[in-house]
Amino acid sequence: MPNLLIQGGQPLNGTIRPHGNKNAALPTLCASLLTDELVVLDNIPHITDVEKLVSYFKDMGSKVYWDKGAKRIELSHRDFGKAGNAALPVGMRSSVLLFAPLLHRIGQVPLAVNAKGCALGVRELDPHIEIMHHFGAEMIQSASAIDLKIAKPMQGCRHWADYMSVTATENFVMAAVLAKGNSILLNAASEPHVQDVCRFLVQLGAKISGIGTSRIEIEGVDSLSSGAFQISSDFHEVVTFLALGAMTDGHVEVHDVQTEHFDLIIRSFAKLGVSVENDGETLSVFPGQTRVIQKPLTSNILPKIEAAPWPYFPVDLLPLMIALSVRAQGEVQFWNKVYENGFSWIPELTKFGAHVVTSDPHRIVVFGNRPLRPATVEAPYIIRAAVALYMVAATIEGESRVIHADPIRRAHPGFVENLQRLGAVVHWD
């Protein structure tokens, strides 16, 4: 795997336009299978999982034109299924998002139970299979595979999810929009990328209400039409560059931001002593900030940032705020309420000299503003943890190395090039 070689200590200055959110792009691409008509998607990031989906569509007979420079994909699935077999793309966890589209199109989903994604913790197939069962699918299981099959059109249903799963919510929505009758999902995920998928389907003629809430109601339609849609900017990338600007005492502006999603995120920056200026569609940080962690009014209570399903603080952003806190003055607790392995990378962070105490698998305390030193660290297969390790290294004078940093490429195309434009001295080794 590629490594990042970093000469730290330079302030980052300049402007950034984030790429499209991969967590919106991938399910939207899968949802395009729900229509035979032309679909045009803009602001598609050039990442490996998109490449795998595009290859899969082509292998199955779809017509796909991808203008990588313009970040646009045009798709026509009228001939999908006339070539190849429906085996899901390997090496990408988002292949579960093909469950509903494939059941609608060809009536079956052959699934090898070894999908790979981040190393954050156990993520079940059961919620997806349970949802498909509610819509009428049958599961056939062997020692190494699970087949989902459906013999007749899906029927609308009411489902109360065990927890707010992003991908399970997206699968429910994709199943329901073409199911007969009405469907209701309770305890639905409401992240910005889930909202993107719903709005894309509405653009094609789906009837969805409750977008952005925990209760989604859908009236099934007979078919979906053609349409065009622009993927929202990646809020993970927005936070990454704002935090880097603050950590290196630089001036960074991030444009094309859906700032209506950032109220809680901006307050979380403020907890760590960083002021973020909101100017409509632009967020900025400026040099000269004190970066002192805010103490609660209640004495003897640690300040904390809790991550949980939206509209809580997004769990994927937690590593970035941990990195930021390492360079802040004071102590702060981080609580990951979602993944049991979300802090497995912390021992690598301490190699820089960071002082972090692990309370339990879901909680840590960072004691900030300790002397740091260059180091060679190993990134886990967790995208934002790899980014966080780079962020800390970028603030330390001298040469550091983040080995096995390739997970960054799963979400952040041109990451190193963007850093270099801002003044960072970093390259793939």
Spans of model-derived segments:
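Short, structured segments at the rim of ligand-binding sites
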Residues: 1-429
